[in-house]
Amino acid sequence: MYVSLVSIHAKAEFLEPFLEATRANAAAAVKEPGNVRFDVLRSVEDPTRILLYEAYRDAAASAAHKETAHYLRWRETVADW
């Protein structure tokens, strides 16, 4: 299994649209054939601190995720947030 932990500090003024876009990406990611798990976690101390826990069958499946339309749309949407 190949696991990625992505730590993000979202800008407070964009938090809700950031979470919406991130949850949409996660919902699509779990349908990928190589995906094992995709969790969107928020800090209880600071809700703008977000951790993405992504588990894939292998490194190739993780790399394939970064080429999907939903991932590319997410990256473009949240780039400045």
What function would you assign to each model-found segment?
Residues E20, A24-V36, A55-W81:
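An amphipathic, aromatic/His-enriched active-site/gating alpha helix that lines ligand/cofactor pockets
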